[in-house]
């Protein structure tokens, strides 16, 4: 029997119950499944067991139990727009489940469910109702036998709600659901009645009896091995156990909502806080799995979630990003400790999650500021039941980048309908315009068709570049201009050459293609002097996955189809490529092992001169972290570790711990695994044989390239030596410039810096005197001191310094400085006045006068614009300020 109703204890109780009853415990599978392209996200507990359900004879276990992370946004199941409006909808939720693959069936499933809710959870049987599919008399009789409840508590449902199927064909079967009755003080009717959507009777557990195989013609055939799939929403059962009928009143959501209210300073608008609490949770889990906001697929769904929450933050009139401030509550041990305990990835990715939430919310705020006034203006003229023009919705989407789903959210709150036809008419017109622009096949399409013909005629290229740097080969095809087959290429011609066999690595997996030389040695069965006919290979590309295309310039003589050549790569360049590629693998390993295990590769470039590695991480690496990385790299390189590669099946590679990139597509069989000590990655690139061949390793830069994505650039070997020499040369030049020995450079620079600061302060003092001489006007508007002045020849940074120095809590300072045809305005607003007016509000006012837009925050803002002599900025601002302060 449970003693504590916290969500973490409920989950543990469920898992422990089924583990004691012979079920193997499975951890939650990821939300993003790499091997199931049919799903955007995992949306049910049974997803990771699909193969066992479709072929139970090959299942490696008979029974299983899990608590599964689920996301229902996009695709067939999409709860995004319902979140906040109902008591039970979430984007992210956990599903508790027990599963049988040919072991127990209906009786076992019903008995387990009954024992858990009655004996473990101690629910009153008088509060429980059960539904069965209308023709599933067996389930009806079993519930009656096992529970002893009256017939009236077992309800037959005729709709498809109580019949589950995996798809149009395949395994399927009737369902049975357990409902909890909250009592007659809550509105709602029994399942199957017109009032069933009320909150009184809540489904807490669904048992699916997979007993049929549906054929193409709709015929249901009995499965030889019947299976069980059950699902219990953790949040729903937590609500029951905590005595509330609203999921957002359970301890987890109460903590998140309280954090949202506290951080925003706004305890009104419960709907907004619910949405923020829900969306923080789902966004955090997606980011923890390596997803970043983007414009396509899963990445766009993450962006939609964050942006929808950002819009509700905006409704709270909170100026800063909020979600990243709420997130720490999710991993707080006292508030929502169960998340961090059961899902440690949230802790590991904490910095990344907070960084992405903050950046994405701040970026979208600009869109909200530009687009919402237009929408609000349109809605002012509409009442509940009216229809918003599809043209306006399209304009918001097309011109301002304002998501349609957020527009629909806003008008839903106003009771306004949406002119879908008008919107889609605009969309279709845009698509037609796009079609006209692309009615002719693109160059890329034509090139692909061209190479398909060549592949059918010549076959795939055999690559031998892992084992050797040179080989004899036959010229199969010569292409000029990218789309013209020729029989011969002469001196000066730039051509693409296809061989039957090649040692040249074609650019892929981030690694640049090889360069080198072709020497013709046999033509029309006659041996030739190797130096008479030479082609320089300037790049190697891969087309249609298996054609290695050598981009060449004929340097001497000619090259003909059918020639036998001696193909040799630039060995020194290849060695540098190998060193940088192996160093990239080691860098990935060191980042995960020393910095953050949740780090994921997001891209790479391996050239002969340098390597570039993009990875998911929310904050800049510190100098200490960069030094640690270099030290660990030195240890691995100097350890002379062997670099081993082998080919195996994809499932065996992943099972063996090999890192697979989510963005890459891999074959099921014949994948190549490269191992360097504890580093294992799927990789088709070339590598050193021992790590000592890498030589030295030096990071030359680390920076942000996108939201939540960092980039490291590094050099190895002789390029690292060149880098050290350049740095030494620069240091010597600096020493000469400041006229001290190299060892004293830092001391001298520090002295010069202090002197420079003294001079800057003296200059600021002079400018401050100039401001005072030019005159600062002071007026009292109510209890507010308004200081203002039209200045000349005062730099912007000095105006800002002056304002910061003299700004008090109940003071507003406005300076305007005219230079030729332009004017710069800087305004400061004391913090006690922010509830009525902010510095950025003044910038907006002035923007209409100077035909420009400015920026800043509540305390300090500035704007640069066109000086219009006829417009008195100070008088206009003063007049509007009087109006604001008098309200």
Swiss-Prot record:
GO terms for biological process: alanyl-tRNA aminoacylation; negative regulation of DNA-templated transcription. Transmembrane segments: none annotated. The keyword NAD does not apply. CDD domains: AlaRS_core. GO terms for cellular component: cytosol. It catalyses: tRNA(Ala) + L-alanine + ATP = L-alanyl-tRNA(Ala) + AMP + diphosphate. Binds 1 zinc ion per subunit. Keywords: Aminoacyl-tRNA synthetase, ATP-binding, Cytoplasm, Ligase, Metal-binding, Nucleotide-binding, Protein biosynthesis, RNA-binding, tRNA-binding, Zinc. Zn(2+) binds at residues 581, 585, 683, 687. Its main location: cytoplasm. It comes from the Bacteria. It is found in: Cytoplasm. GO terms for molecular function: alanine-tRNA ligase activity; aminoacyl-tRNA deacylase activity; ATP binding; tRNA binding; zinc ion binding. Pfam families: tRNA-synt_2c, tRNA_SAD. InterPro entries: aa-tRNA-synth_II/BPL/LPL (IPR045864), Ala-tRNA-lgiase_IIc (IPR002318), Ala-tRNA-ligase_IIc_anticod-bd (IPR018162), Ala-tRNA-synth_IIc_core (IPR018165), Ala-tRNA-synth_IIc_N (IPR018164), Ala-tRNA_ligase (IPR050058), Ala_tRNA_ligase_euk/bac (IPR023033), Thr/Ala-tRNA-synth_IIc_edit (IPR018163). PANTHER family: ALANINE--TRNA LIGASE, CYTOPLASMIC, ALANYL-TRNA SYNTHETASE. Consists of three domains; the N-terminal catalytic domain, the editing domain and the C-terminal C-Ala domain. The editing domain removes incorrectly charged amino acids, while the C-Ala domain, along with tRNA(Ala), serves as a bridge to cooperatively bring together the editing and aminoacylation centers thus stimulating deacylation of misacylated tRNAs. Belongs to the class-II aminoacyl-tRNA synthetase family. Catalyzes the attachment of alanine to tRNA(Ala) in a two-step reaction: alanine is first activated by ATP to form Ala-AMP and then transferred to the acceptor end of tRNA(Ala). Also edits incorrectly charged Ser-tRNA(Ala) and Gly-tRNA(Ala) via its editing domain. This is Alanine--tRNA ligase. The gene is alaS.
């Amino acid at each position: 029997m449970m003693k504590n109703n916290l969500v973490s204890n409920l989950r543990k109780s469920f898992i422990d119950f089924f583990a004691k009853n012979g079920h193997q415990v499975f951890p939650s599978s990821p939300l993003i499944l790499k091997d199931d392209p049919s799903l955007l996200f995992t949306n049910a507990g049974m997803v990771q067991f699909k193969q066992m359900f479709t072929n139970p004879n090959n299942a490696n276990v008979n029974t299983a139990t899990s608590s599964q992370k689920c996301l229902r946004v996009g695709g067939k199941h999409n709860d995004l727009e319902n979140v906040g409006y109902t008591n039970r909808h979430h984007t992210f939720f956990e599903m508790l489940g027990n599963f049988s693959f040919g072991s127990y069936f209906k009786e076992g499933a019903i008995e387990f469910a009954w024992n858990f809710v009655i004996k473990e959870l101690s629910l009153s049987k008088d509060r429980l109702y059960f539904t069965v599919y209308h023709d599933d008399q067996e389930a009806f009789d079993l519930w009656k036998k096992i529970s002893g409840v009256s017939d009236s508590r077992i309800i037959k449902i005729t709709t498809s709600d109580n019949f589950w199927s995996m798809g149009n064909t395949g395994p399927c079967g009737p369902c049975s659901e357990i409902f909890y009755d909250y009592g007659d003080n809550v509105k709602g009717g029994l399942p199957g009645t017109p009032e069933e959507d009320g909150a009184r009777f809540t489904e807490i557990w669904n048992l699916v009896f997979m007993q049929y195989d549906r054929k193409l013609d709709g015929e249901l055939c009995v499965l030889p091995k019947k299976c069980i799939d059950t699902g219990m929403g953790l949040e729903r059962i937590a609500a029951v156990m905590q005595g509330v009928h609203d999921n957002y009143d359970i301890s987890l959501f109460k903590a998140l909502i309280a954090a949202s209210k506290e951080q925003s300073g706004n305890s009104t608008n419960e709907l907004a806080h619910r949405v923020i609490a829900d969306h923080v949770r789902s966004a955090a889990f997606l980011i923890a799995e390596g997803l970043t906001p983007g414009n396509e697929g899963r990445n766009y769904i993450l962006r939609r979630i964050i942006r929808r929450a950002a819009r509700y933050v905006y409704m709270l009139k909170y100026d800063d990003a909020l979600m990243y401030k709420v997130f720490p509550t999710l991993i707080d041990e006292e508030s929502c400790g169960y998340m961090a305990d059961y899902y440690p990835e949230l802790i590991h990715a904490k910095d990344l999650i907070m960084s992405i939430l903050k950046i994405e919310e701040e970026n979208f705020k600009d869109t909200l500021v530009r687009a919402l006034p237009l929408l609000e203006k349109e809605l002012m003229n509409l009442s509940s039941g009216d229809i918003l023009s599809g043209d306006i919705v399209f304009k918001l989407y097309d011109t301002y980048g304002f998501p349609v789903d957020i527009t629909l959210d806003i008008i839903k709150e106003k009771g306004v309908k949406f002119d879908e036809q008008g919107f889609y008419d605009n969309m279709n017109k845009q698509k037609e315009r796009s079609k006209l622009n692309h009615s002719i096949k693109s160059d890329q399409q034509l090139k692909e068709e061209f190479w398909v013909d060549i592949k059918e005629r010549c076959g795939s290229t055999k690559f031998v570049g892992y084992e050797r740097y040179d080989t004899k080969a036959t010229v199969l095809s010569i292409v000029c201009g990218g789309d013209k087959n020729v029989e011969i290429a002469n001196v000066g011609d730039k051509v693409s050459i296809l061989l039957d066999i090649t040692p040249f690595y074609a650019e892929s997996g981030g690694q640049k293609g090889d360069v080198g030389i072709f020497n013709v040695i046999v033509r029309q069965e006659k041996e030739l002097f190797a130096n008479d006919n030479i082609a320089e290979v300037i790049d190697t590309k891969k087309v249609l996955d298996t054609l290695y295309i050598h981009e060449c310039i004929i340097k001497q003589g000619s090259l003909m189809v059918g020639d036998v050549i001696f193909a040799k790569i630039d060995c020194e360049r290849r060695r540098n490529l190998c060193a940088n590629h192996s160093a990239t693998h080691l860098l990935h390993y060191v980042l995960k092992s020393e910095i953050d295990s949740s780090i994921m590769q997001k891209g790479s470039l391996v050239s002969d001169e340098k390597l570039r590695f993009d990875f998911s991480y929310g904050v800049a690496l510190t100098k200490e972290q960069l030094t640690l990385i270099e030290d660990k790299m030195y240890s691995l390189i100097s350890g002379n570790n062997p670099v081993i590669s082998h080919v195996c099946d994809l499932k065996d590679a992943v099972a063996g711990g090999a890192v697979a990139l989510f963005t890459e597509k891999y074959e099921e069989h014949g994948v190549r695994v490269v191992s360097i000590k504890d580093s294992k990655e799927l990789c088709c690139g070339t590598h050193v044989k021992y790590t000592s061949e890498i030589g030295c390793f030096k990071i030359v830069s680390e920076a942000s390239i996108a939201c939540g994505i960092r980039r490291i650039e590094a050099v190895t070997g002789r390029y690292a030596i060149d880098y050290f020499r350049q740095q030494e040369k620069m240091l010597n030049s600096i020493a000469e410039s400041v006229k001290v020995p190299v060892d004293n450079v830092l001391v001298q620079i520090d002295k010069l810096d202090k002197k420079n600061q003294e001079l800057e302060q003296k200059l600021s003092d002079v400018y401050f005197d100039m401001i005072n001489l030019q005159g600062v006007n002071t007026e009292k508007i109510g209890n507010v001191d308004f200081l203002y002045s039209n200045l000349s020849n005062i730099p912007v940074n000095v105006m800002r310094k002056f304002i910061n120095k003299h700004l008090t809590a109940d003071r507003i300072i406005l300076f305007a400085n005219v230079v030729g045809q332009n004017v710069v305005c800087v305004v400061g607003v004391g913090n006690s006045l922010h509830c009525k007016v902010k510095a950025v509000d003044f910038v907006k006012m002035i923007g209409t006068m100077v035909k420009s837009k400015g920026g800043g925050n509540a305390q300090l803002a500035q704007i640069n614009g066109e000086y219009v002599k006829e417009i008195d900025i100070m008088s206009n601002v003063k007049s509007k300020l009087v109006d604001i302060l008098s309200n």
